[in-house]
Amino acid sequence: MKLSRRSFMKANAVAAAAAAAGLSVPGVARAVVGQQEAIKWDKAPCRFCGTGCGVLVGTQQGRVVACQGDPDAPVNRGLNCIKGYFLPKIMYGKDRLTQPMLRMKDGKYHKDGEFTPVSWDQAFDVMEEKFKTSLKEKGPEAIGMFGSGQWTIWEGYAAAKLFKAGFRSNNIDPNARHCMASAVVGFMRTFGMDEPMGCYDDIEQADAFVLWGSNMAEMHPILWSRITNRRLSDPNVKVAVLSTFQHRSFELADNGIVFTPQSDLMILNYIANYIIQHDAVNQDFFTKHVNLRKGATDIGYGLRPTHPLEKAAKNPGSDASGPMSFDEYKAFVAEYTLDKTAAMTGVPKDQLEQLAQLYADPNKRVISYWTMGFNQHTRGVWANNLVYNLHLLTGKISQPGCGPFSLTGQPSACGTAREVGTFSHRLPADMVVTNEKHRDICEKHWQIPAGTIPAKVGLHAVAQDRALKDGKLNVYWVMCNNNMQAGPNINEDRMPGWRDPRNFIIVSDPYPTVSALSADLILPTAMWVEKEGAYGNAERRTQFWRQQIKAPGEAKSDLWQLVQFSRRFKTEEVWPEALLAQKPELRGKTLYDVLFATPAVSKFPLSELKEDQLNDESRELGFYLQKGLFEEYAWFGRGHGHDLAPFDDYHNARGLRWPVVDGKETQWRYSEGNDPYVKAGEGYKFYGKPDGKAVIFALPFEPAAESPDNEYDLWLSTGRVLEHWHTGSMTRRVPELHRAFPEAVVFIHPLDAKARDLRRGDKVKVSSRRGEVISFVETRGRNRPPQGLVYMPFFDAAQLVNNLTLDATDPLSKETDFKKCAVKLAKV
């Protein structure tokens, strides 16, 4: 068989990338070379992080046999990271679940029974009985769902609609609560709208990059490759990296800064002070487009109300703020002097000054990037607000090459969790359940009775754990996440609730994860291109893909599970008489009829699918379900700055960045000439706010919820590594990735190890006030903590690092701080 030069180059690029990581590529590069003519190719976004890389998926005989970077994808331009090259193998683990499994004893469900295969009807029978019993005895607050930033857009939309409109319960929250909630609240407080104003095209036009708590080299490697290219192509481009420990991103840094945990708040206020003291405020921009407010302080740590820290807080959970003058703000940040900041953070003065100069220089276009170091923080919302302050003071925002940019960890934390509104307090397009007008908009569009959607905010992720433990939440459906491994404080606040006989736990997953094995019912789930899907990435880019193969055995998509389960409930079983009296025509109808088989959703016929196009859900129902749900959902944002393109446009494009108006996507929001919502002559308009002005907040440094002491003498920070994604439920089933990083380790400074008589490779017990884990000492390698801090990745199911972590959260966003708790080490 003849092979074109282009195909040869592609195949070798795949092999070279894997070889660089010390990995082999069986079935990937060889499949491209040896079987190219027999393979059918189609596009899809990558299954992993929020970068949103485009890939070409090769299928043959009903299996994914190859994957390569899509050269036409604007995000990654044909390049994949090492996880992306091994995408096919995530679906073919030997322990893939293919049928529902229920805990049974003596032929019926039992909390302490053994997992036994059952049919879908049997699984839904038990679920139906548990849901109906809890709804009847305790009401909608007794049921809940924990979803995902890995849901497709229509899966998240269907879940939110089923729970908030169908079951009348706002107890639905995504695992994005653990990673992006602080970014959401930060955006909403400062700009009145969620998500970044810039895009990845900023990278090629920036003069400086500042990373705040973000190891892009490992967590967003494709974007890092673009930053690296920009930095190495121009000696005047600068990179600053801030973290509580050194990591691979420091290798490119001109200014690598290691600071004391939690003290990033001080650094941010110091830079604001520097900008003012050096007359670097962009007065024209500031005067026209910015307001100043002083936020409430001493707001607690999101712990249980009985916790001493919550009792001691003066304003627990307060989001209050009041107006202030520029002189008052100037006086506020003046306290954050160079001397004080250096002393409190442990950062040398010259490094602090170099960092501040990047922001203050009017001729430097600066991008600030951050991820979990900022967001997983008991003052994560404040950290987000404070970095916006720097860009608003200098006017370095909403223009090519400059702006603040919150990077996303999951493939659709933006497109699904945030935009769709699967958080316990949100509705589509930045609307919230507490706003009567917003509820009314949803109820009218969904054609359900007024008052159907509850006005009370539902339980967020950590509150769900506590409610399960307390017996207040009794039926809990977990989809597309592994929270028993990923969530905080497993021993004290999660496992007790899951194994409580009063509660019934359902987990939908492709694999027997820690969460699945802790549940009462496991539902086998279709993965990635085994279903039609859509994700929204960090730069507001919405991307579609088609179903390309069938799921194994009886595995079904999350969308199928949600829609089919809705058939089990009639309106009179879930809605009070007062609601039904408003719309008597809905009596006797199922939630499927009312929510998913409506004229608005079911109006797109199967004829819109190609004859040979797979779409299991739609072909079973008799209409194009995904298109109906998407178009119904997209209505919420059109004309309101969240405009999505028509459904069919996305199948013909490599994604489009919203707002999409008149067929044109938006690269930079809020600025004239870039954003269709900013009129000629306005310059800038932050139209999420009533007056079109963004807000600078005065917010102080406040300490962490838990710090080292004489007994627990080390900080613990948790996170990820390049080779594995989150809890490793997919990547650890890829042999090459597993071999590259087979088990978690404790990264520790050599002097801390020596002081404890520990050597590299030693087995060590890591203990906190909440639990312990056995791991292995690592004094070398990619992560280099300072003395007094250890770092552990959480991908290893054999080392449940979250037995150690504290369930403290940001009181405003309810996001957990996984970066700061106190531990001690002991040689085993």
From Swiss-Prot:
Cofactor(s), names only, from the UniProt record: [4Fe-4S] cluster; Mo-bis(molybdopterin guanine dinucleotide)
Keywords carried by this UniProt record: 4Fe-4S, Electron transport, Iron, Iron-sulfur, Metal-binding, Molybdenum, Nitrate assimilation, Oxidoreductase, Periplasm, Signal, Transport
Family matches, as Gene3D superfamilies: 2.40.40.20, 3.30.200.210, 3.40.50.740, Dimethylsulfoxide Reductase, domain 2 (3.40.228.10)
Gene Ontology cellular-component annotations: membrane; nitrate reductase complex; periplasmic space
SMART domains linked to this entry: Molybdop_Fe4S4
InterPro entries: Asp_de-COase-like_dom_sf, CT_Nitrate-R-NapA-like, MoPterin_dinucl-bd_dom, Mopterin_OxRdtase, Mopterin_OxRdtase_4Fe-4S_dom, MopterinOxRdtase_cofactor_BS, Periplasm_NO3_reductase_lsu, Prok_molybdopt-oxidoreductase
Annotated positions binding Mo-bis(molybdopterin guanine dinucleotide): 83, 150, 175, 179, 212-219, 243-247, 262-264, 372, 376, 482, 508-509, 531, 558, 718-727, 802, 819
Residue stretches making up the 4Fe-4S Mo/W bis-MGD-type domain: 39-95
Subunit structure: Component of the periplasmic nitrate reductase NapAB complex composed of NapA and NapB.
Protein name as catalogued: Periplasmic nitrate reductase
Native source species: Salmonella arizonae (strain ATCC BAA-731 / CDC346-86 / RSK2980)
